[in-house]
């Protein structure tokens, strides 16, 4: 049985590879849209849509989809649109608690199996000056929340309560449990 990751995220690829999984990378192509409004439902729905999009082309394979967002001060924050948006996001997160949500979906069409789940991790951003925020804005345009705490030069996050791998993009504790229960 073949495992496919429906994502081109370097962080997800690295986390799964480090954990010893062998898989193909076939990213989902469609826009990320959902009708849900709550963060945990949004990430589960988007992860499922990504997994189904790829699984439709590879029905005998087990396909993994994932989606990450940041929730802070009542706002859902995805990837920044541009450098100005990244700076606006970083100002919102500055010196604040936020929650990082990642939804995971595992689908195998031929086996008629589908699992979904999500992880939520609380993070505290340190207080940074406008100069420091400008320095890091635009560095992480492909990441929800416009930051990458796994990078040594990213100084935004000072405290994590929960799964560090969730903040990076794939909650490995959840994924390992789900894939085992899935029978892979």
UniProtKB/Swiss-Prot annotation:
Residues forming the catalytic site: 67 (proton acceptor)
EC number(s) on file: 3.6.1.9
Broad class of where this protein is predominantly found: cytoplasm
Keyword Cytoplasm tagged: yes
Site, Important for substrate specificity: residue positions: 11, 68, 150
Catalytic reactions on record: dTTP + H2O = dTMP + diphosphate + H(+); UTP + H2O = UMP + diphosphate + H(+)
GO terms assigned for molecular function: dTTP diphosphatase activity; UTP diphosphatase activity
Keyword Cytoplasm on entry: yes
Known function: Nucleoside triphosphate pyrophosphatase that hydrolyzes dTTP and UTP. May have a dual role in cell division arrest and in preventing the incorporation of modified nucleotides into cellular nucleic acids.
NCBIfam families: maf (TIGR00172)
UniProt record similarity statement: Belongs to the Maf family. YhdE subfamily.
Name of the protein in its database record: dTTP/UTP pyrophosphatase
Organism: Elusimicrobium minutum (strain Pei191)
């Amino acid at each position: 049985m073949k495992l496919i990751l429906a994502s081109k995220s370097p962080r997800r690829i690295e986390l799964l590879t480090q954990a010893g999984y062998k898989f193909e990378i076939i990213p989902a192509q469609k826009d990320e849209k959902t009708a849900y409004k709550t963060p945990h439902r949004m990430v589960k729905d988007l992860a499922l849509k990504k997994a189904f999009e790829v699984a439709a082309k590879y029905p005998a394979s087990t396909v993994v989809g994932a989606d990450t967002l940041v929730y802070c001060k009542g706002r859902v924050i995805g990837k920044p649109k541009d450098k100005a948006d990244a700076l606006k996001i970083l100002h919102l997160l500055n010196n604040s608690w936020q929650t990082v949500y990642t939804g995971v979906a595992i689908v195998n069409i031929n086996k008629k199996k589908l699992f979904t789940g999500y992880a939520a991790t609380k993070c505290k951003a340190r207080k940074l000056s406008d100069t420091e925020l400008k320095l890091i804005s635009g560095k992480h345009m492909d990441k929800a929340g416009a930051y990458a705490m796994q990078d040594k030069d990213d100084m935004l996050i000072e405290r994590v309560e929960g799964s560090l791998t969730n903040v990076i993009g794939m909650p490995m504790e959840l994924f390992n449990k789900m894939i085992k229960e899935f029978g892979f």
